[in-house]
């Protein structure tokens, strides 16, 4: 069984002859300490990392553990020993233990792909964290659990065509024109002769039209013959009958009627109240 012991920072101790001791005096040297040692070329069954409590915040690198794990054999154990001083310096380190970030060690296990197994504490404030590297079978089962499921069926390719119009409902253009499909009704028939006859009677001018049917021609003929003139029978001395109520006198026969043009008195007199 081969093993290695890594001493970080100011930690010093004696080990047995079967263990390779590697020094990592600085935080930066932790990731390369094993690769720089020729005696650790073969995979190790166990790696023990020792560090004093006072050096943990400044000398332990959570990312460096990932560079050490490749030297560990599958199923091998890695332990981090955080040692507290046992002599007169214990009183000085006891205060430092309370502010130590212990999660840095467990975080380094996760980043290195190790499975944490145990955490032990001693009476002096030290702790030992143990983790194990996965075996080849465990790595394969983990990859299979997270991989895609293959049902073994033959792969089929689906082809889509943009010219596939089998599902389109086509409409006959002739049905839109003749109304056979019930979508458009034929336009109504216009009686052009009736429209022409109605347009012949147009008394909008100063005189009645030749084909007058509204009675204006008869009225004009009676006026020209000296017959009863409704305009002459209804008038006032003010002479403002055609201008509207604002200009009419109190005895004007056209009070309450709209203004009119000279010569159109007969049209105003024929207006009937709708109320």
From Swiss-Prot:
A motif (Cx2C motif 2) lies at residues 249-252. Its cofactor is [2Fe-2S] cluster; [4Fe-4S] cluster. The keyword Mitochondrion applies. Residues 203-214 are annotated as: Fe-S binding site A. GO terms for biological process: iron-sulfur cluster assembly. Monomer. GO terms for molecular function: 2 iron, 2 sulfur cluster binding; 4 iron, 4 sulfur cluster binding; electron transfer activity; metal ion binding. A motif (Cx2C motif 1) lies at residues 238-241. It is found in: Cytoplasm; Mitochondrion intermembrane space. [4Fe-4S] cluster binds at residues 238, 241, 249, 252. [2Fe-2S] cluster binds at residues 203, 209, 212, 214. Keywords: 2Fe-2S, 4Fe-4S, Cytoplasm, Iron, Iron-sulfur, Metal-binding, Mitochondrion. Residues 148-183 are annotated as: Linker. It comes from Thalassiosira pseudonana. This is Anamorsin homolog.
């Amino acid at each position: 069984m081969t093993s290695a012991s890594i001493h970080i920072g100011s930690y010093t101790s004696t080990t047995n002859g079967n263990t390779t001791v590697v020094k990592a005096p600085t935080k930066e040297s932790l990731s390369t300490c094993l690769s720089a040692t020729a005696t650790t070329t073969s995979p190790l069954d166990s790696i023990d990392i020792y560090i004093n409590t006072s050096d943990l915040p400044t000398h332990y690198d959570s990312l460096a553990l990932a560079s050490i794990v490749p030297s560990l054999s599958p199923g091998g154990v890695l332990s981090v020993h955080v040692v507290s001083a046992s002599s007169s310096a214990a009183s000085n380190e006891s205060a430092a233990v309370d502010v130590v970030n212990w999660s840095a060690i467990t975080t380094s296990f996760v980043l290195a792909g190790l499975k944490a197994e145990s955490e032990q504490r001693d009476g002096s404030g030290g702790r030992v964290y143990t983790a194990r590297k996965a075996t080849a079978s465990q790595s394969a089962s983990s990859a299979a659990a997270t991989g895609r499921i293959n049902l073994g069926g033959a792969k089929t390719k689906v082809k889509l065509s943009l010219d596939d119009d089998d599902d389109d409902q086509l409409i006959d253009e002739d049905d839109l024109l003749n109304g056979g499909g019930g979508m458009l009704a034929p336009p109504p028939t216009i009686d052009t002769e009736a429209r022409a006859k109605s347009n012949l009677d147009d008394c909008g001018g100063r005189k009645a039209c030749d084909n007058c049917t509204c009675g204006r021609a008869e009225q004009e003929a009676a006026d020209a013959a000296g017959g009863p003139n409704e305009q002459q029978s209804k008038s006032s001395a003010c002479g403002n009958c055609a201008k509207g109520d604002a200009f009419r006198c109190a005895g004007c026969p056209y009070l309450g009627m709209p203004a009119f043009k000279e010569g159109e008195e007969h049209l105003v007199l024929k207006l009937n109240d709708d109320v």
